[in-house]
Amino acid sequence: MTKKDKGPKFANVTTKSGEVVKVFEDLNDFETFIKNETEDEEFDHVHCHLKYYPPFVLHESHEDPEKIKDSANSHSKKFVRHLHQHIEKHLLKDIKERIKLPDLKFKDKAKEESFEHIVWKYNDVTQYHGKDFEIHITVECHNDSAIVDVDYLTKPLTAAVEA
């Protein structure tokens, strides 16, 4: 008897504007969802959110969130450096693989810093199966926790209508 393959676990959250956003707490579930949406041809209109401890933080705490150091936050240069490396070398790379666009470059990058948080924004316009769409990824870390927020949004590009 084989074990049933369960889909990614997430919660649906409705925003003030009425949009339903899928919220994930596991990186693998998040990546699986993105992969499934791409395979289902719904890749150009996805909005989901991920709240997770980065793998390097869990590794340092021996996979126990209770043992994560209080210093693992946006005020720690080491944490920020490792998080940025994780984003650039793993998170973005894995997303590109899941949506089957390994050549995606995220040319439009930005970083915003304040006392409360650091935000990295990655944007690009791309095409898949003949459909043009925008992809926006926002990664945020805070001054009071090692939890990282990732917002993933894709929107179809509509051709400008000439009057």
Curated annotation (Swiss-Prot):
Coiled-coil residue spans: none
Subcellular location as annotated: Cell membrane
Cellular component GO terms held in the UniProt record: plasma membrane
Keywords, alphabetical: Cell membrane, Membrane
Membrane topology: Peripheral membrane protein
One GO process term, biological-process aspect: energy reserve metabolic process
One Pfam assignment: RGI1
Family as reported in the entry's similarity comment: Belongs to the RGI1 family.
Purpose of the protein: Involved in the control of energetic metabolism and significantly contribute to cell fitness, especially under respiratory growth conditions.
Protein name per Swiss-Prot or TrEMBL: Respiratory growth induced protein 1
